[in-house]
Swiss-Prot record:
Record-stated family: Belongs to the bacterial ribosomal protein bS20 family.
Gene responsible for this protein: rpsT
Keyword tags: Ribonucleoprotein, Ribosomal protein, RNA-binding, rRNA-binding
GO cellular component, one term: cytosol
Pfam families per UniProt: Ribosomal_S20p (PF01649)
Classification lineage: Bacteria, Thermotogati, Thermotogota, Thermotogae, Thermotogales
One GO BP: translation
Function: Binds directly to 16S ribosomal RNA.
Name of the molecule in the record: Small ribosomal subunit protein bS20
MF annotations from Gene Ontology: small ribosomal subunit rRNA binding; structural constituent of ribosome
Xref: InterPro entries: Ribosomal_bS20, Ribosomal_bS20_sf
Amino acid sequence: MPNIKSAKKRVRVSEKRRLRNKAYKTFFKNRIKEVLKAIENKEPKEVVLELTRKAQAAIDKAVSKRVIHKNQGARRKARLFEKVNEYLRTLETTQE
């Protein structure tokens, strides 16, 4: 445990930030999981696209709050869109 007053404050502040960052990370990870689960359950196109928009917004918010690096956010979105686009292509081929 720190003895100096400023060090004690740094411990309090960093713990508060850690919890806030954890909440943002959990939020956007759950949004991504919702999209992947919708793809797995073969949900309609509109549902998947709506969930994808929400996931994208959650990732962008985490990037803007500096919870994750912008490149990590871009990478996560790219991988998610890759899976969504693949699913949408399979939907189109099955409809024909």
